[in-house]
């Protein structure tokens, strides 16, 4: 496999785009590689400018539960496009999508559509602070909630990939209101409650930005109880896990009803769309009927709303979708672990629905400290081997992988075989 055109394209991009990419992880820096420049995608496959093709386990970082260029979703987008790209005015589609989202999630009375997960979490926190009338926020080590200033403290995703505990340019006056607790640790969490005047808590119930690290059920239930005890608003960030891990996101596994929740990725089916929502008494604080301001020129964009609505309709029609995706994820993770064991390579694997993760680690990963003990050098070698064998994995050990509907058992078995070849070559130093 060659990447000559991608190398040239990347060098050209670096002349006019900061870092050559529009989101840091895409640069392949942590795996010491060159990112393939993508020409197109179809189903489970990506095709690059060098005429290479890959089985894609990134799926645009999660949104594409039906794979690339799904014909039904594509056709609906095209039909909507013919009517106009954006109006800056209400449409019936927005109301329909809101109803579909609300119908899947317990405790969700109203939503507000936005353009990105960052907007959703940022807006939810502003709303929670207004409702609680308290400024301090608790987040958890390794959880990533977008790149708004108050949340870039001990974050996962790119911040973990590049070894940054926070970000330059974030004033201390912003970060001083952010208290950081250990994931899956109630004692650490209650200590944070005691330190500050905590108005809200935000958490990924199925963390996907320090690798895949699900919350323990007793921890999440205990966190809900602590929020009630200290009168803080509980925000579940389900931008990644919502409609991915299951139709009801984390609620399928934990049954926890938050005060506010954020969704993204799948609800936009690959176009820019996210939302936040929750109890009516909180949501009604939003302008224009309340005093909490939030706005967006392209919020509720008809193309994104149409794409998301098409995806949700397909999801709801397919009664066995999540069962099939989960089975493929289990087949993959068990296969990877079995192959690693054949070469005495320490590998921990797990999945939640169509989300999966693996760590080159001897022990189970329960929090950010555990994740940071993983062998990132081994991951980089494995990633490069798999890429050149036609398997497109997330280019950081601190990201989650995704199964899509067009994938088959035969594809998964092929990937496991390629993993076996890769481990063999790594051990032999080839």
Curated annotation (Swiss-Prot):
Localization annotation: Cytoplasm
EC number, as in UniProt: 5.4.3.8
Cofactor(s) needed: pyridoxal 5'-phosphate
Modified residues (N6-(pyridoxal phosphate)lysine): 265
Keywords: Cytoplasm, Isomerase, Porphyrin biosynthesis, Pyridoxal phosphate
GO biological process: protoporphyrinogen IX biosynthetic process
Pathway: Porphyrin-containing compound metabolism; protoporphyrin-IX biosynthesis; 5-aminolevulinate from L-glutamyl-tRNA(Glu): step 2/2
Reaction(s) catalysed (UniProt annotation): (S)-4-amino-5-oxopentanoate = 5-aminolevulinate
Quaternary state and interactors: Homodimer.
Alphabetized PANTHER family for the sequence: GLUTAMATE-1-SEMIALDEHYDE 2,1-AMINOMUTASE (PTHR43713), GLUTAMATE-1-SEMIALDEHYDE 2,1-AMINOMUTASE 1, CHLOROPLASTIC-RELATED (PTHR43713:SF3)
Protein name: Glutamate-1-semialdehyde 2,1-aminomutase
Organism: Helicobacter pylori (strain P12)
